[in-house]
Amino acid sequence: LSNTRGIGAARRWIKKEFEKISKDCGGCLEVKEQWTLVKGNPKSRIKKDTWIVNIYAIKRGTKYPNRYVIMIGDIDSRISDPLDGEGDSPGANDNATGMAGALELARVLSKYDFPTSILLAGLSGEEQGLYGGKFLAEKAKIEGWKIAGILNNDMIGNIEGVDGVIDNRTFRIFSEPYSILETEKQLKQKRFYGGENDGESRQLARHVFASTKTYLPEMNPLLIYRLDRFGRGGHHRPFNEVGFPGIRIMEAHENYNRQHQDIRTENGIDYGDVISGVNFEYCAKLTAVNAAALATLALAPAKPKNVKIGGIVQPSTILSWEKVD
């Protein structure tokens, strides 16, 4: 494998960067690789046996070491043909921006201790079928991780929409209303005692909105009440599908001339996901959005247990719950 080109070179470089950050903080980060073999299938985007490799770093929590808040970016990219594994596919915005954000937060947050563990990840195989997220979510489920939230950052660097709109303050937060694993009884309870905005992923999205308004008031977060864009997918979805709360954070205005395109110029229009299409100040702002959300979640206590609601025929609602450590 090349040390300068392709996803193998990218993941090795990312691992080295995590290791450098860990060295600077006295070994405070646990840097890990997750290798999973995907068998080739002529009907899928992976035609031959392929290793999917995730790279991640953990800043272990001082009080809740098995409780996690997670930020993820992707380390794979694609061009016009999703099966083209040879053509140049820089993926500067989709999704080097999300991965750069995860690396920067590893550097910044490693300087502090938190009660809850913080995990920063670079996941592979997103464009081929959300494989990296699927494998890390399965690992978390099998090992019994307690996950407070997954922040999937997928494209956080573009401010110029294909419609010509330029906006360096607005971003979108996608979230599903409730877990697909909820039972009929749980859904009935939600109908009578809550609503779709009380689902865990929706609550997580609202927390990101609130922390943004507190610490970055100049930013304009948009709560989008859907799992993702119409017909599209992201690496938060595999976590949702096994019951973990997860959301997608991304730019507000997409530019399809720069997304999933061969690098070329046609009729005076430049195509391709190259670095000139990334606004670094905007990327830094959305990285700060993640910093605020991760830090506040990691400093918070565990969620309360045995929550009960009362107050029928009374002027005020009465809430009760078990004391949190």
Give the predicted meaning of each segment.
Residues 31-33, 54-58, 68-73, 91, ...:
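Structural recognition of the beta-strand scaffold that forms the well-ordered cores
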Residues 1-60:
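A non-catalytic alpha/beta surface segment that caps or lines the substrate-entry region
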Residues 315-325:
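Conserved aromatic anchor
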Residues 1-8, 40-46, 83-95, 108, ...:
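Second-shell loop/turn segments in exported
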Residues 300-310:
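Proline-enriched interdomain boundary motifs that mark the N-terminal boundary
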Residues 57, 71, 76-77, 81-130, ...:
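Alpha-helical metal-binding/catalytic segments enriched in His/Glu/Asp
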Residues 123-237, 242, 246:
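Metal-dependent peptidase/peptidase-like ectodomains
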